[in-house]
């Protein structure tokens, strides 16, 4: 039957065709989310592709479980994630680290995800008991790795707490010594006088030591070299620098040694 609305001699247009790929099955959300998670360069320190882009590696198990899994899958169960990988045919290819591979899960080949099919729970070549044993072995391995990671975190936390306790203990000890020092200084004027004598003695010892060191250093230069430095004006500058260094050494020794000795329990007891 001719179409009355078409001009004479014109062929009718071809019927509409379905869009290419319209009826193709989209990859499962688990595979899509896993691909996006592995492909994100911002989290390469946690999970990333291997060098060849044929597998992915979980580098930081703790961060992967506590940060990435909740972000993409709304849970933090690494064992559950491993079970999902197994159902889609992924295999663990490295015994010493969490590295997984699938022939259709490749870097830059997102379109291949649709080829990954979910495996049937039972196949004719395997018995239910055999599959259950393999699943239990994989879960045991996952749990053992999680235990190792938790123990490492626990050890790190213990070391940090111990260091903080030592710092607090040292601060409290210095506070007690300072309070004892101030109390005795207020009660006995002779106490302060004796401490000042100790300080002067300490300064004199340091000055004598520094003078001896300078003399030994100067003796290594000939009189002609010293005279040449004096004529060029470097001798005075050298002496000024030596005096500044000497003053810094004395102040540092007093800060590091004198007050540490002064605030010690033995020193406070001997001056009382």
Swiss-Prot record:
Which residue stretches belong to region Hydrophobic repeat HR-A/B?
132-186
Return the motif ranges for AHA: 256-265
Q: Does the keyword Nucleus apply?
A: yes
Keywords tagged on the record:
Activator, DNA-binding, Nucleus, Phosphoprotein, Stress response, Transcription, Transcription regulation
The subcellular localization recorded is: Nucleus
- Which GO biological process categories is it annotated with? response to heat
The UniProt annotation gives the DNA-binding region as: 27-121
- The short motif Bipartite nuclear localization signal is annotated over 201-216
Fill in the PTM field for this protein.
Answer: Exhibits temperature-dependent phosphorylation.
GO-annotated cellular components: nucleus
Q: Which PROSITE patterns match?
A: HSF_DOMAIN
> Which parts of the sequence are annotated with region: Disordered?
1-26, 203-223
Instruction: Kindly list the GO molecular function terms attached to this UniProt entry.
Output: DNA-binding transcription factor activity; transcription cis-regulatory region binding
UniProt domain comment: The hydrophobic-rich region (HR-A/B) corresponds to the oligomerization domain. AHA motif is a transcriptional activator element.
Q: How does it assemble?
A: Homotrimer.
Q: What does this protein do?
A: Transcriptional activator that specifically binds DNA sequence 5'-AGAAnnTTCT-3' known as heat shock promoter elements (HSE).
| This protein's name | Heat stress transcription factor A-7a
